[in-house]
Amino acid sequence: MYNLLKGTWALFFGVGMMMLANGLQGSLIGIRASLEGYSASAAGIILTGYYAGFLLGALYIPQRIKNVGHVRTFAALASIASISILIHSLHISFLGWFIMRFISGMCFVGLYTVAESWVNDLSDNEHRGQALSVYMIVSMAGSAFGQLFLYIADHETATLFMIVSVLISISLVPILIVVSKQPDFSVAKFFTVKELYKASPLGVVTSIMTGLAHGTLWGIGSIYGLKNGLSIEQVSIFMFTFVIGGAINQYLVGYLSDKYDRRTIIVIVAFLASLFSVLAVL
């Protein structure tokens, strides 16, 4: 496990910077849309653009990785994502923001694919759960601490958009200059949803349900906070606590998944998540 982390520190650092940026931009755009006078429905549609791009990118980007490799794909997508967030501050319109969110979604699903396939390739089955849990800890911690950047600048200026762009650009540096073994993507096989469901029904259903819940909170969590009287600083703390809780829990879940039946762990974690969600609204 130590050797794995030693060989992938550049990747994990890049992921951390990338997720700082993504965590900040998700809440920032929701807040800024509200400040610009968009209704909750309109803001929700704008933010949905990210997930539409995410879905399309999941079908298109793997072929790009196969053709040009992990490092070049990561560099290209990070550069496009960095540009797209700056355009948000240059041109404020419903359609313009939707398109930029769509492009950002395509870029980030590609960045996730590069990072996760890289980690997966470098870990054996005995330690895969722990390796992926470390990846998720870095990812979610980055997203969580990204929320706190809302404290440092005026939300009605371009400063926070620039900070997001800078963080994305920084994520490139260690990956481009540190030589590391790259996965062989030449044997990658595309799986249909039907094939995935046949291989792991519980995994597919859990992924869909988790995506629905996760996307809803990420998409309108900041707007919900503002509409219910929270200040922008309180919204950042609200979103931070949601994400950091997941980060803290990741390694334990990954460790248990390496020791016990992963289906059992999924059921237990899903039950606990549902229970605490119900308690939160009582």
Q: Which residues does each PLM region occupy?
A:
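Cytoplasmic helix-loop-helix junction between adjacent transmembrane helices
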Residues: F102-I137
